Regions:
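C-terminal/peripheral segments of proteins
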Residues: 2-515, 520-523, 532-710
Length: 710
């Protein structure tokens, strides 16, 4: 263990220059808990838990509600929230060790805290800063009350920490982190970066014209890991200042990233346009800190930053790493040369403010005004409102590039001609607003097929230098097929489409399975039987499907290697391996998918339908375990269906994979798992009367118990 940690540190050092190395023991000191309690007294929020433990937070001010939201989330998942804060500071390796060191380095490389220190009070409005302060105060109050659970350096939290977290995460949605990690490892440049399963999501809106009952329907369905820093948390917020949203957020967010209110709602999937450029710099052979630009030698901005890494117990090592910046942006030096990165969202603090405005929006115009700030660098939004208006907005801060250059390749960094400085205005991004087709979708796919023709944007109307993606995910293919075939969608239809567990005939999975099924396995009894199963497979993953285990496990193993940029394993060898395992564990090659696909949480162990990139999106651990089963670890992280009826009534139904709490002792640790496994939704209580009828807990954080309403 000790040797492994030391070797890992040595490997990290090899990624860049080292100027200082010191081992030390960290003395764990506590923050001023009394000051945190005193600061918390300035806020007044009421947190009511419904029968599933979902927190409904109310308060007079938005800042009060943010305070209560932070406190409630800390009650449910304090360890993850603390790690989010440490990640934002570039201090996570001080707790989690070498595996977090590269992430810490990226915080410094991107210059996040330099920008915050310079412009926090300038770029962010007073209401936004007040909201951030309230959220930080909620986390600090919980930490003060649970000092024994506080990680080193995790408290006190400041509003600036939350801004740093947004600045770090937003560009990662379109793949900046993959590009940076690739360059740090000395790998090849991929523009745009490869899509990853962690970035999947789904959103669909149905207009009254396509609904059987004249209702407007919105599905928001973030898809990602079920636990950890990118897991989704469900809540409801109402304030006396007009904040009224139910939806989801990820740890460290004081705002809903996807949600719905009485007037409007929105969801998104991660889009992957070309929003970053890599420049090859011409270094000075006589001075490693100079590079050529427009005929002159310019000095790189050079900083040294500390990276504290926990080895074991209280023993830490602090390294000092070189951080370089050019006119283009952050610079990485590796064995292949000197590379600069320029990316959408660079040095922009206002992402959190844009989401704040979205949370407060009550019309399409106010919602798009928030996007028009240009502070959210990507994300493909779906919008719906109570008036029946729906829209798809392929949002992005698209660089205005000189079309004479090939922006799909690394660029010469020695001339100003390749240095873009402006973005296309929001008016120029692809949009579909109130289409005659009556529906829009977003499923990590091209915006040129987000509805039925002729209502789609035309690809030729957008410059190729915008780098807009043109491919379709399986979820997009299936959603288009199902919805285009139904002119009168009922509530039951819409739910069934969300939980559709099949693959399109032209999906990557179907193409791979067809190839394997059509091969000649004569003379190999095991593969002959496997091929027979694949030929009969209907491309679906319902629980009783007997073709799914062999087909899906094989396809997942092969296609995930493609997705992650690893060498592709030989498909027939993979098929043989899983055929052998199915025979070993189940006595047959075709057990039901329910026997193999499992949702596990504590003592809960339930069968699941679905698979990767299905509308019923489920991600699994690689391969199978020693019982022949595979455990779901990601996919449909939050499912919310918001409906505005013809007469203006608002309804929200939802489900998460496990429950609202990460504590094994909580009754809400896995109480939603049976619903999730069965593809069912719970109804969220939206009126005060409905909420109080099923309230399981009511509190006012930081206030005496006798002040809590009964």
């Amino acid at each position: 263990m000790i040797l492994r940690s030391i070797l890992a540190v040595v490997a990290f050092l090899a990624l860049g220059s080292l100027s200082f190395f010191a081992a030390h023991q960290t003395r764990l000191t506590w923050f001023d808990a009394g000051a945190a309690i005193e600061a918390g007294a300035k806020y007044d929020a009421t947190v009511v838990r419904d029968r599933y433990g979902v927190p409904h937070i109310s308060g007079r001010r938005d800042a009060d509600v943010a305070f209560g939201l932070a406190y409630a989330h800390a009650q449910d998942d304090f360890p993850t929230l603390q790690r989010a804060v440490l990640a934002a500071r570039g201090r996570l390796a001080n707790v989690d060790g070498i595996q977090a060191a590269q992430s810490d380095y990226l915080v410094h490389l991107l210059g996040i805290w330099n920008a915050i220190d310079e412009r926090y009070d300038i770029d962010l409005s007073e209401p936004t800063r007040a909201l951030l302060d309230g959220y930080a105060a909620g986390l600090n109050l919980y930490a003060a009350q649970h000092k024994g659970d506080v990680l080193p350096e995790a408290a006190p939290v400041k509003g600036q920490d939350i801004v740093a977290l947004f600045m770090l995460r937003l560009p990662f949605f379109y793949g900046l982190d993959e590009q940076l990690r690739g360059l740090l490892a000395g790998g090849e440049v991929e523009i745009p970066p490869r899509k990853t399963a962690a970035a999947r999501a789904l959103a669909i809106a149905i207009a009254p014209s396509r609904s059987a009952d004249g209702a407007t329907r919105l599905l928001l369905n973030p898809q990602g890991p079920f636990t950890g820093p990118l897991s989704w948390y469900e809540a409801r917020a109402t304030s006396g200042e007009g904040w009224n949203v139910a939806g989801g957020l990820i740890p460290g967010s004081p705002l809903f990233l996807a949600g719905a209110g009485p007037d409007i709602g929105w969801g998104f999937s991660a889009n992957h346009p070309d929003l970053l450029d890599v420049y090859t710099l011409e270094g000075n052979p006589n001075d490693r800190f100079f590079y050529r630009f427009d005929g002159d030698w310019r000095r790189l901005t050079v900083r040294e930053v500390p990276i504290a890494i926990r080895l074991f117990g209280p023993l830490r090592v602090t390294l000092r790493r070189e951080v370089l910046t050019s006119l283009q942006g952050p610079v990485i030096r590796n064995e292949r040369g000197l590379f600069a990165i320029r990316y959408a969202g660079q040095d922009d603090l206002k992402g959190v403010e844009a989401f704040y405005r979205m949370n407060k929006a009550r019309t399409y115009e106010s919602f798009t005004d928030a996007l028009a700030m240009g502070a959210i660098p990507s994300l493909d939004f779906v919008y719906a409102d109570k008036t029946g208006r729906i829209a798809n907005i392929y949002n992005g801060t698209f660089p205005q590039r000189d079309p004479s250059h090939d922006w799909t390749q690394p660029l010469a960094g020695n001339v100003s001609a390749t240095l873009w400085k402006t973005y296309f205005p929001f008016a120029d991004v692809p949009k579909v607003v109130a289409p005659g087709s009556g529906f829009v979708i977003s499923a990590n796919a091209t915006p040129f097929q987000s509805t039925s023709d002729p209502f789609n944007p035309k690809e030729e109307a957008f410059p190729s230098s915008m780098g807009i993606e043109t491919g379709l995910s399986n979820r997009a293919r299936r959603a288009l097929s199902l919805i285009e075939g139904d002119r009168s969608i009922t509530a039951a239809d819409f739910k069934s489409y969300k939980f559709d567990a099949c693959y399109a005939p032209d999906s990557d999975l179907a193409v791979l399975i067809k190839d394997l099924a059509e091969r000649n396995y004569a003379g190999d009894a095991l593969l002959e039987e496997a091929g027979h199963i694949l030929r009969r497979y209907d491309l679906c993953t319902e629980k009783e499907n007997r073709g799914a285990p062999l087909a899906l496990l094989t396809a997942i193993t092969v296609l995930q290697a493609d997705e992650q940029g690893r060498p592709r394993p030989e498909p027939v060898a993979v098929l043989r391996g899983f055929a052998t395992r199915m025979l070993e564990y189940f006595g047959r090659l075709d057990p039901t998918w329910a026997e193999v696909s499992r949702l596990r949480r504590g003592t809960v162990d339930l069968p699941l339908s679905g698979g990767p990139d299905a509308l019923r999106d489920i991600e699994f651990e690689p391969g199978v375990d020693d019982t022949g089963t595979t455990r779901a670890v990601g996919g449909d992280a939050l499912t919310v269906l918001s409906t505005w009826s013809r007469d203006g009534q608002w309804q929200v139904e939802s489900v998460v994979p496990y429950g609202s709490s990460s504590s094994e002792s909580s009754p809400h640790y896995a109480d939603q798992a049976p619903l999730f496994a069965d593809g069912r939704l719970k109804e969220l209580p939206l009126t005060e009367g409905a909420l109080m009828e099923q309230a399981t807990d009511i509190e006012r954080p930081g206030k005496p118990d006798d002040t809590v309403p009964q």
